[in-house]
Amino acid sequence: SAQRVRTADRGLSAAFDRSISDIGALRLHDPSGHRRPVIAAGAPWYMTLFGRDALISAYMALPIDPTLAIGVLEALAELQGRDVDLMSEEEPGRIMHETRYLGVEAPTLTGGSTYYGSADATPLFVMLLGELSRWGLDDDALRDLLPYADRALAWMQDYGDRDGDGYIEYLKTSERGLSNQGWKDSADGIRYRDGRIAEAPLALCEVQAYAYGAYRARAAIGVRLGEPEVVARCGQLADELKAGRLVRALIREA
């Protein structure tokens, strides 16, 4: 059951209660048979599982209901990319953008049941697992999810960083896919300072911040599990972003 908060400020208590109610209204049960909780992106048009939306919502809801984060991570782990498919933009280790459950008539953008065109869902997956570990996820559950997090980290370097410059960028591989693959995913959502629509490949500053968070999260998990090599490697990657790459990403404009 969700936590309840009572304060002397009735407005704050009412806002908290409304938030709990809204989360409950968007809560789904994964129909795969596991009956684990996940959260939809929004009603009525997005009443299904979206990677980015579910991960951020579950992260923010950790003080209320950590089981939601577990359900989201498990559901996304099962759908994690295994092969290279240009139409769905599936790639090994990539966390999907959206899925349509069996029985839902509307397909994804590219016509299949699952579409992977997201630059940020994959590092967010690792970030959420790291935060859930801090909130007391038991060792067995952590170890069950860890291989998926490591495959996500591998995607960030092998596929997310297409040109080896240290940034995660995106460029759609399907004509029907999303031109922009961050949270502003409308076709005209990303623009240069002069108003021109930015052309991919694009490396969004917030995605680089998520990458930093993912490396830090995996390093923290490595400390907990006694993995000194992982701690050193992920710590170095995070330090490199903080020392230079992330700063340049925030100020550079193509």
Task: For each feature predicted by the language model, list its residue ranges.
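Acidic/polar, glycine-enriched structural segments that form the non-catalytic walls/loops
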Residues: 1-48, 139-146, 150-161, 222-236, ...
